[in-house]
Amino acid sequence: MKKVKIPFDIMKEIINDYTLNNISVPQLNKKYHYSNTVLYRELRENNIQIKSFEEASRKYEINKNIFKQITEQSAYWMGFIVTDGSFQKRLNTYQLVIHLSNKDDNHLKKIREFIQPNVKITYTKENSCRIAFTSNEICNDIWKYGIGINKTKEVNLSECLIYNRDFWRGVVDGDGYLGYCEKGNNKHRLEIVGSYSLLSYFVEYCKTIIPNFKNTVKPHKSIYVIHLGGNTAKTILKSLYENSNIYLDRKKEKYEEIIAL
């Protein structure tokens, strides 16, 4: 069988698409109508380095350094990832995936702005939205702080997160309930669900705000819950949300509403 050779002018376009426009080989296949085998061979013969699966999966360049240091944003988003994020593996490449209700799509736009502003948000027929970032380095950096691949199991948080209000605000925005009762003294309410270890760490954080904090973690169906009420809830909520710069809009609005009571 005669060896297929791509014409020089077309090959220049292919190289440009592959190296500068980050178009994958399967996409080049559809665009130029050459098989993957031919495309890979021609790229190698033109001394073009073949991308890893991670690089090929990433349409846009990601800031890989964002979780290497603890900032208000990085701590907050790790807290939110603990509750509403997941890590998905394909071959040897990991994706950080966040899946929310459509009503919170603006929050996905916030994390997109933080990590990579051009990544696409996808919407489903089930009134949900999703964003995914492909990067082994970002995932590994998050795991180093004690947030595991399987977040439903116990976590082993680094001390820099245990006592970090931005991290816990992210957790509350993800799996917390803020409310109030019209009657009684315990008007303010804060509830968080999660694993036993995660909520135990939250107790440790609360003790730095209220030294005689006595609330305990209790079983709740297949997971655990902690309930805070009255001035305790109000004090902890103020420690989390007051003068903060990153938050889930509707949770911050609820905080402002109940803190005024």
Language-model segments: which ranges?
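Internal intein/HINT superfamily modules and their associated LAGLIDADG
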Residues: M1-L261
